[in-house]
């Protein structure tokens, strides 16, 4: 079968991401996959396309490698910043390994020093750390609070490689459990603490226990709300990025099964780095690799017949900078037509 025939074969769904642009209710888009498959390039390109049809778009990197700055040739940090050349597309890079001390400080507690008299900061920290994954989840919660206040119409997450991605998606549940546990303990011990504190009603350092607990409850409610949104296919989807090789396909299948177990919608796969050597090509390596890629492309078609599978070519140069990203992004909505083999 020629590549052109493969491209135009009758599929149940079109081989583009146009459906994501048409889905006006979409609020959260996660882009993930194994390392080195073009995940950041894909997320940047999708963000560019979404910016054409949405009022305001935010692209967030949760990958510690932080490739957004390299992709756009512009420095990004933990505050949202407009991308050069765009009026409605912003980006930010966050560290998913945030610290619990930072969150306690943001919630009105300054750690053991300011709460030292009663050791309350240490108690909360120890309690929080007793729940696996809560340190990263705290950082995630802070991001959600910030993003929610910024009121972007759609948010795209350029996630860390596969394992980290799936853990990231569990954070809402993890943090909801942690905060519920702390709220329960505050109900049990709150009266005792207030009795110890006497009429001041405050903690050492001028903090107020009720204010801290109120902020924690507010954070828990935010997490619960976003957790529900993540499980709503009208609001959230996950775009899987892979290459046509065994390990990448294996990781993609594992990821899709886990996403399904979390009740998170996924119906788009982007297959990057495909070779399309011409029929007169003298590159034997290219032909051999194309033969292997065809085998895995066929498997992808069989496994994911109800997915939008986008086939992206291997390019001769890096996709960096606004102009090259825009050209690449165009192929996400207008299928690449390879030369006849």
UniProtKB/Swiss-Prot annotation:
GO terms for cellular component: GET complex. It is an enzyme of class 3 (hydrolase). ATP binds at residues 34-41, 245, 272. The keyword Lipoprotein does not apply. The active site is at 63. Coiled coil: none annotated. Its EC number is 3.6.-.-. It holds the Pfam family ArsA_ATPase. One of its GO terms (molecular function) is ATP hydrolysis activity. It is found in: Cytoplasm; Endoplasmic reticulum. Gene3D superfamilies: P-loop containing nucleotide triphosphate hydrolases. InterPro entries: Anion-transp_ATPase-like_dom, ATPase_ArsA/GET3, ATPase_ArsA/GET3_euk, P-loop_NTPase. CDD domains: ArsA. One of its GO terms (biological process) is tail-anchored membrane protein insertion into ER membrane. Zn(2+) binds at residues 283, 286. Keywords: ATP-binding, Cytoplasm, Endoplasmic reticulum, Hydrolase, Metal-binding, Nucleotide-binding, Transport, Zinc. Belongs to the arsA ATPase family. Homodimer. ATPase required for the post-translational delivery of tail-anchored (TA) proteins to the endoplasmic reticulum. Recognizes and selectively binds the transmembrane domain of TA proteins in the cytosol. This complex then targets to the endoplasmic reticulum by membrane-bound receptors, where the tail-anchored protein is released for insertion. This process is regulated by ATP binding and hydrolysis. ATP binding drives the homodimer towards the closed dimer state, facilitating recognition of newly synthesized TA membrane proteins. ATP hydrolysis is required for insertion. This is ATPase GET3. It comes from Paracoccidioides lutzii (strain ATCC MYA-826 / Pb01).
């Amino acid at each position: 079968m020629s590549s052109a025939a493969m491209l135009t074969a009758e599929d149940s769904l079109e081989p583009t991401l146009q459906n994501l642009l048409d889905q006006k209710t979409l609020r959260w888009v996660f882009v993930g996959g194994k390392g080195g498959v073009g995940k950041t390039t894909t997320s940047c390109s999708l963000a560019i396309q979404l910016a054409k049809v949405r009022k305001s778009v935010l692209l967030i990197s949760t990958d510690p490698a932080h490739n957004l700055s390299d992709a756009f040739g512009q420095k990004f940090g933990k505050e949202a910043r407009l991308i050069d050349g765009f009026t409605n597309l912003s980006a930010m890079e966050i560290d998913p390994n945030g610290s619990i001390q930072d969150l306690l400080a943001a919630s009105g507690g300054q750690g053991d020093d300011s709460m030292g008299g009663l050791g309350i900061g240490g108690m909360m920290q120890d309690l929080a750390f007793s729940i696996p994954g809560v340190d990263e989840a705290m950082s995630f919660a802070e991001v959600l609070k910030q993003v929610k206040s910024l009121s972007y119409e759609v948010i795209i997450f350029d996630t860390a490689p596969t394992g980290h991605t799936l853990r990231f998606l569990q954070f809402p549940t993890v943090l909801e459990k942690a905060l519920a546990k702390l709220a329960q303990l505050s109900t049990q011990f709150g009266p005792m603490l207030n009795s110890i504190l006497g009429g001041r009603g405050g903690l050492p350092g001028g903090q107020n226990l009720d204010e801290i607990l109120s902020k924690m409850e507010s954070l828990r409610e935010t997490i619960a709300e976003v957790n529900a949104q993540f499980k709503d296919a009208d609001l959230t989807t996950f775009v899987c990025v892979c290459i046509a090789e065994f390990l990448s396909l294996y990781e993609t299948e594992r990821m899709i099964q886990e996403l399904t177990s979390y009740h998170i919608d996924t119906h788009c796969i982007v297959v990057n780095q495909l070779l399309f050597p011409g029929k007169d090509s003298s590159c034997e390596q290219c032909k051999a690799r194309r033969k292997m890629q065809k085998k895995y492309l066929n498997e992808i078609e069989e496994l994911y017949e109800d997915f939008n599978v986008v086939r992206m070519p291997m390019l001769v140069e890096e996709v960096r900078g606004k102009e090259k990203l825009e050209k690449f992004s165009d192929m996400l909505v207008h299928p690449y037509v390879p030369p006849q083999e």
